[in-house]
Amino acid sequence: VEQYRDAVWQLWKEANAGFEEEKLIALDTLSSNSSGYWKLPENLEPNAVMPYCWGMKGAVETGAELPLFLYLHGSGPKEREWSTGLKICRNFDDAPSVYFIPQIPNEGDYYRWWQKAKQFAWEKLLRQALLLGEIDPNRVYVFGISEGGYGSQRLASFYADYWAAAGP
């Protein structure tokens, strides 16, 4: 079984290497400087650009697989909510770990973390993060505050096979 699992994993990596898509920025120390953005499909949400922070906390042993936390902010003004989320996540005592902290692309009717355009982003995140080989696929978590907490619960039902836990 292990031999076939490894063969399927290699084929999966090769198939994904051929995707022409925006990639995650290089994994670095979690800070406001470790940020990038993804353009989400126009047919799923108009004018949707998702800024994100992507980074590690703590010293990492060579070859160690780290937990990944997806943090979803609340529904206040998106700039303030996003910067507050980064501060909160940097203070959690969970190092070594990796965080993906997105900013909601649009306010108004599109201020929901479970909508199709954001699902596109989560599927891209999961695929790209797991392909790095540094993330423990059994320790991928989603959580948030307020609208982010609600979103984490909705996403728990959509991606139950991916999350180790989901919590508001």
Regions found by a protein language model. Name each.
Residues 59-64, 111-147, 157-162:
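Gly/Ser-rich "nucleophile elbow"/oxyanion-hole loop immediately N-terminal to the catalytic nucleophile
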Residues 66-68, 72-131:
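Active-site machinery of serine-nucleophile hydrolases
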Residues 150, 164-167:
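Accessory recognition modules or surfaces
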